[in-house]
Amino acid sequence: MKAIMLVAGYATRLYPLTENKAKGLLPLAGRPIIDYTFDKLEKIDCIDEAILVSNHKFYEQFVQWANGYKGRIKITVLDDKTTSNDNRLGAIGDMQYAIDQCNVDDEIMVLVSDNYFTYSLVDYYNFYRKVNADCVLGCEFDDMDYLAHNFAVATIDQDSKITSLVEKPGVATSNIGVYATYIYTKDTVKLVKKYLAEGNSKDAPGNFPSWLYHFKPVYLYKFAGECYDIGTVKVYNELTDKLSKQNN
């Protein structure tokens, strides 16, 4: 299995913190945010390589981080050659870029670098093995308005199979929100190109499984734990304070 980490965003909502530093490399309780995700990835033995897709602006920063990485997993950093939001490839465009550049012919786990979470990726991987099908990951929300405007909203059947999945619908049809961590089978990796060729949205990684479940079974792993989407300075500061207090 390969991990593909989408790190090519410009994180303008986090300015001024991210004007000159990639969001995934911002310090969180003394470590880059991305380190916490790699701690979890390292526990999945079958992941032998992580492909990071960066924009041109922050490419060298991720190369420098990768050169200092001490873990087991091989890290490949790609420059998607984009320089602003105006010419970006989009999250799903970057997925295909990684697949093409690295000739990926394997199962993939797709992640982002700006989520801090406490749940186990091993448990998620084991769920994927159990259902033997494409998977998304999510949890239940109390704030339905926040859910509907910030996440893909899913409904599932009694077997946890997706029955509907809509990216940021505006009005939530359930209380289940999906985070940007996906596992796709080897056969599904080949469908990313088909999705893009049909002219579907290149942005927001949740748009791909929203299309996919119409053709193939997609299952939802409901995690126990916390996940923070570090999308604003407010969330970043609150999480920094929380972790600093835990470490003291």
Which residues make up each language-model segment?
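Conserved beta-loop-beta/alpha segment of the NTase-like Rossmann-fold superfamily
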Residues: 59-63, 67-156
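Structural beta-sheet core signal
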Residues: 5, 52, 110, 136-137, ...
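Phosphate- and divalent-cation-binding pockets in alpha/beta enzyme and binding domains
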Residues: 13, 36, 61-62, 120, ...
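N-terminal glycine-rich phosphate-binding loop and ensuing alpha1 helix
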Residues: 1-60
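Residues at the starts of beta-strands that form the adenosine-phosphate
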Residues: 2, 48-50, 74, 107, ...
